């Protein structure tokens, strides 16, 4: 009975170590994903004002050429 308890305790201990290692890897993977998402958001923030300013400069000229009311 004592050896059975010892074996179960050993399995439990090894299982908890394995779970904690998997959890650390998962947390590291999630951090990497978050970094990519943050970079995408930064790129979107940089791209949107640029696109708006280009559209503000280009659209009036295009509208003028299409309607020929300059």
Curated annotation (Swiss-Prot):
Residues 1-22 form the signal peptide. One of its GO terms (biological process) is innate immune response. It is found in: Secreted. Expressed by the skin glands. The keyword Secreted applies. Its main location: secreted. InterPro entries: Antimicrobial_frog_1, Frog_antimicrobial_propeptide. It comes from the Eukaryota. Disulfide bonds join 64-70. Residues 23-46 form a propeptide. Keywords: Amphibian defense peptide, Antibiotic, Antimicrobial, Cleavage on pair of basic residues, Cytolysis, Disulfide bond, Fungicide, Hemolysis, Immunity, Innate immunity, Secreted, Signal. Belongs to the frog skin active peptide (FSAP) family. Brevinin subfamily. Antimicrobial peptide with activity against Gram-positive and Gram-negative bacteria and against fungi. Has been tested against S.aureus (MIC=5.5 ug/mL), E.coli (MIC=6.5 ug/mL), B.dysenteriae (MIC=2.2 ug/mL), and C.albicans (MIC=7.5 ug/mL). Can regulate or mediate antimicrobial response by stimulating mast cell degranulation. Induces histamine release. Shows cytotoxicity toward solid tumor cell line HepG2. Also shows a potent hemolytic activity (LD(50)=5 ug/ml). This is Brevinin-ALb. It comes from Amolops loloensis.
